[in-house]
């Protein structure tokens, strides 16, 4: 689920000020938004726009291309959902908006947010927004498109498929959003993204949103964006407010015992544990389950249905621990997660930011704990340098950071 209630805004000074025309708008009521869109915003639980929403929504509604970057858990999905919905004409049941996400789970969550915020624009109909992801029948996609889908949210592979089959008509598209744009423009997705662009109207508005925006990705955007408005945070700001970061020096063979000790030391509402391989995820989940912890695990080799079931169990609290690979490092929001454990440090620096954003979202207090072997020391230093942050050794009284 997305945000319920107040978002703690980022420090205003964390945004670059060299982009002309970017003025923070502190209230949704002061933005040029349709009355029924405002009804949806407030009924969804938004109270005050976050920093990225204050800066990105109005430029989005003007129709120009936009590149927006902000930390995980600060309302990026809300920002582009509101901007997108304001740009659509609900009098016409044709496809007008396309949102591309790197994973099925993120696509489904995004579609839920758009559906709820756009409820009153669509006069109560939930069918205006549909998902197009792998693991579902193509015939079901045809049915959705024929029933008047106005916003499509999908993964690149499936969107390419239904577009090439002629099922997804793109001539009326007004807006394309690339969510988690750094991942979407990586080598794994780049070819599919370029395939999709071949089918899009020349004058389509393109919006990129992500927590990280490396220089090579910004360079790529020059190929398909026209004079975009840029809202970029300063590199030294790319750490998470409300997330206290620690490390534990531990060798590989002692990691499991250290993990067990942690769970015996403090009472944890819900936690996410990241490991780098599917095999280790399965092994960790098995070890924790045998110690009477309620544990779920998720990785890319599970079917779509299995992954949805796991996330449902974790969201409703039936499971208190989720062990996973980087599959869910982006975009999954579970309200009661207050601790993230990197059993293995991530293999790429950008994923560190996405991982630790699972705890303490939307201003809630959270803790990130990194298990660091002797071989990992240099990696940890690189992470600290990249984000201009300091990761402290876990203190004896660390339970205080969880509100105990």
Swiss-Prot record:
Assembly and binders: eIF4F is a multi-subunit complex, the composition of which varies with external and internal environmental conditions. It is composed of at least EIF4A, EIF4E and EIF4G.
PROSITE patterns the UniProt entry points to: DEAD_ATP_HELICASE, HELICASE_ATP_BIND_1, HELICASE_CTER, Q_MOTIF
Record's protein name: Probable eukaryotic initiation factor 4A
UniProt GO BP: cytoplasmic translational initiation
Binding-site residues for ATP, renumbered to this chain: 70-77
Position of sequence motif Q motif: 26-54
Record GO cellular component, one term: cytosol
């Amino acid at each position: 689920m997305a945000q319920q209630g107040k978002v703690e805004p980022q420090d205003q000074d964390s945004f670059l000020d060299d982009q002309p025309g970017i003025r923070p708008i502190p209230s949704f009521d002061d933005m040029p938004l349709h009355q029924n869109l405002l009804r949806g915003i407030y009924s969804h639980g938004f109270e005050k726009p976050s920093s990225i929403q204050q800066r990105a929504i109005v430029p989005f509604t003007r129709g120009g291309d936009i590149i927006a970057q902000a930390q995980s858990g600060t309302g990026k999905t809300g920002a582009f959902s509101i901007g997108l919905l304001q740009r659509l004409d609900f009098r016409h049941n044709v496809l007008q908006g396309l949102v591309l996400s790197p994973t099925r789970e993120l696509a489904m969550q995004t579609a839920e947010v758009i559906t709820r915020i756009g409820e009153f624009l669509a006069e109560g109909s939930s069918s205006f927004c549909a998902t197009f992801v792998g693991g579902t029948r193509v015939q079901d996609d045809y049915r959705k498109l024929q029933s008047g889908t106005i916003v499509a949210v999908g993964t690149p592979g499936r969107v390419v498929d239904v577009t090439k089959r002629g099922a997804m008509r793109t001539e009326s598209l007004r807006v394309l959003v690339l969510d988690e744009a750094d991942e979407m423009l990586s080598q794994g997705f780049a070819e599919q993204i370029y395939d999709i662009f071949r089918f899009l109207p020349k004058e389509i508005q393109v919006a990129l949103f992500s927590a990280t925006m490396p220089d090579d990705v910004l360079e790529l955007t020059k190929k398909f964006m026209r004079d975009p408005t840029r809202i970029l945070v300063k590199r030294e700001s790319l750490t998470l407010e409300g997330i206290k970061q620690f490390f534990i020096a531990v060798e590989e063979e002692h990691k499991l015992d250290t993990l067990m000790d942690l769970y015996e030391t403090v009472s944890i509402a819900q936690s996410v544990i990241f490991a780098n391989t599917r095999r280790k995820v399965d092994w960790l989940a098995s070890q924790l389950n045998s110690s009477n912890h309620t544990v779920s695990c998720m990785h890319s080799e599970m079917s779509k249905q299995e992954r949805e079931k796991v996330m449902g169990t974790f969201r409703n609290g039936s499971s208190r621990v989720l062990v996973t690979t980087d599959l869910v490092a982006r975009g999954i929001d579970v309200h009661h997660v207050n601790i993230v454990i990197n059993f293995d440090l991530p293999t790429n620096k950008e994923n560190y930011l996405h991982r630790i954003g699972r705890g303490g979202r939307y201003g809630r207090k959270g803790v990130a704990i990194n298990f660091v072997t002797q071989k990992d020391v240099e990696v940890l230093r690189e992470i600290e340098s990249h984000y201009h942050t300091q990761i402290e050794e876990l203190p004896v009284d660390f339970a205080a950071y969880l509100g105990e």
